């Protein structure tokens, strides 16, 4: 049987707040090291 690939991208989080995005990533991948970077337009 094929190995289950760990989730590594969250395109659905575009437009969310950093807090919302971080919470969702940690739900999907509890061992993730989530780093929030500032974005300047």
Curated annotation (Swiss-Prot):
Gene Ontology MF, one = serine-type endopeptidase inhibitor activity
UniProt xrefs under InterPro entries: Prot_inh_pot1, Prot_inh_pot1_sf
UniProt keyword annotation of rRNA processing present? no
Coiled-coil parts of chain: none
Q: Which UniProt keywords apply?
A: Protease inhibitor, Serine protease inhibitor
BP terms from Gene Ontology? response to wounding
Q: Name one Pfam family in it.
A: potato_inhibit
Q: Which domain of life is it from?
A: Eukaryota
UniProt function note: Inhibits chymotrypsin.
Q: Which family does it belong to?
A: Belongs to the protease inhibitor I13 (potato type I serine protease inhibitor) family.
The protein, known as: Chymotrypsin inhibitor
